Every structure is written in C-alpha cells, then in structure tokens.
Amino acid sequence: MYSVMKAVYDSGIPISFKCSMVLKACLFEAGFLDETRHTVDIDANWNTDTPPTAEQMVESLQRAINRGGMDYEVRLYRMYGEKRSAGFELVDRNTDEILFTMDVDVNRPITPTQIYEVDGICFRGVSPLQMIADKVAVVSTDKVFRRIKDVVDLYYISKVFEFDVQKIYSTLKCSERTMGDFQGFLQRKEDLRHSYDKFRFAGGVNKPPFDAVYREVKIYLKDVLPKEASKEYADGSQQ
C-alpha cells in the first residue's frame, strides 16, 4: 500500500494521506514492529480549487499507479458527497481480486501535512498533531463505541508523541471540529470493553489488554478530560 501512496505522491495529485497508514509510519519510525497496526485500506484527503469529477479522480489515480509499475486497476464504487468520502477499489488485473480500498475525502478543511518516509518510500500525510486531534475528537463523543480502534491508536500514539493541549484545541478549531464531553469514554467503560472485545485488527494482530489500553489513554487525555476525571490523577486514584 505504501507503494501506491508513493506513486500518488510522485504524480503530484493533490492528495494527503491520513489515519492508519500515517500512524503505521510514525510507529515504524519509533521502532515498533510493522505488524503493530495492520490495516486493509488507505484514507486520504483530496483538496483542489475545483471539485474533481469521478472520471478525473479515477484517471489520475490510474495514471499514477501505471507510472509506478503496478498492475492494478482503480475502480470507483462510491462517489463522494456531503459527509461522504469517495470509495475506490484497487484490483489485481490478473486475478480480479480486490487487494485493498481507498477512502478519499474531497475538499474538506485543509489540514497541516508533512512528508513521511518508510523504507525509502515517501508520501505526504497529515501531521501527527492533526492525527491526534482527529482521534481525540472521536473519543470525546459517543462515536467512540463505533470507532474503538481510535482508542487503541491513542494508546500507541501516547508512547510516541507528547500531548500538547493548547495545540490540540487550536488544531481542532482550524479543522472545524469540536471536542465532546467524554461521557461515553468515562462513564460507560464496560460498554467500551464490549466493543473492544468484538473488535479485531486486520491481519490477525494481537490486541493489548483492554484495561491497559483504557488506563494509558485516560492518562494521556487527562488535560482535556472533565475536571472531576482529571482530579483523580492529582489524588492518585486513577483507574
């Protein structure tokens, strides 16, 4: 998948990558094993002055992949719309097997990006700060029960990046997102555990124990949690 991302980057398509593939790159650079965070899809942002047509997107991606020497066919299975990303399948031309998918948001608020490198492969991705802010925004609302993987991601992120509360708030504001009250995360721990138990990483990757994940993420987020929850840390009574 990183080869596809490199081909897109080399082509000049106005795409920046985000989510799992960026996190994997950060973890890999920090010394984690490649299989720590496995994924079967690529997430990205496409930002242009003029909204691209379906044909323009498919043709641009296909041309980039062809130039990269990969025998894949790009197929659009979902056109983008309001609050809906474009969905692409990358298909092996020889077997017609769907190798992985790409979800591409189009002309959402522009976010800070940087160049990443994994084993000599370069691509443009959202900044670590943006990645953290996006995941905190999810965990702060009841979306956390559907996006339990963001809790796991924050567990790993906490081992690599410091949490700068002022920069997080600023990043959320710039990307037109808000932070919730964390009531689901704080008050419904057993429901979270249930969601976590059902969740399976792609590729058969082993999950760390839920209690360890929950404890470390709660500590990591202490500066944005409600005062009552934050006070636990001052009293030494965190759970």
Where in this protein do the model-derived segments appear?
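An acidic- and aromatic-residue-enriched active-site/binding cleft used to recognize and process polar
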Residues: S20
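Structured mid-to-C-terminal alpha-helical surface segments
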Residues: M1-I15, A25-H38, I42-Q239
